[in-house]
Every structure is written in structure tokens, then in C-alpha cells.
Amino acid sequence: METNILALMATALFIIIPTAFLIILYAQTNK
């Protein structure tokens, strides 16, 4: 179970971090 939770967290971070980076970059570009 713990390994599944860690894998889920790793996948979530792998998706969330680039998405957040693109959103910030997009917001800065529109300023």
C-alpha cells in the first residue's frame, strides 16, 4: 500500500509541477 501511495504522489507531482510551471510561464507572458 505504501508503495502505491508513493507512486501515486510521484505521478501527481510529475503531472502537477510541469502544469504549474506552464501556467506561471503563461501568466508572465500575458503580463
UniProtKB/Swiss-Prot annotation:
Any GO BP annotation: photosynthesis, light reaction
Record localization: Plastid, Chloroplast thylakoid membrane
Membrane-crossing segments per the record: 5-25
Highest taxon of the lineage: Eukaryota
Membrane topology: Single-pass membrane protein
Main location: plastid
InterPro entries in UniProt: PSII_PsbM, PSII_PsbM_sf
Any single GO CC term annotated in Swiss-Prot or TrEMBL for this entry: photosystem II
Alphabetical UniProt keywords: Chloroplast, Membrane, Photosynthesis, Photosystem II, Plastid, Reaction center, Thylakoid, Transmembrane, Transmembrane helix
Keyword Glycosyltransferase set for record: no
Family of this protein: Belongs to the PsbM family.
Subunit record text: PSII is composed of 1 copy each of membrane proteins PsbA, PsbB, PsbC, PsbD, PsbE, PsbF, PsbH, PsbI, PsbJ, PsbK, PsbL, PsbM, PsbT, PsbX, PsbY, PsbZ, Psb30/Ycf12, at least 3 peripheral proteins of the oxygen-evolving complex and a large number of cofactors. It forms dimeric complexes.
Function of the molecule: One of the components of the core complex of photosystem II (PSII). PSII is a light-driven water:plastoquinone oxidoreductase that uses light energy to abstract electrons from H(2)O, generating O(2) and a proton gradient subsequently used for ATP formation. It consists of a core antenna complex that captures photons, and an electron transfer chain that converts photonic excitation into a charge separation. This subunit is found at the monomer-monomer interface.
NCBIfam families, alphabetized: PS_II_psbM
Protein name (database record): Photosystem II reaction center protein M
Organism: Mesostigma viride
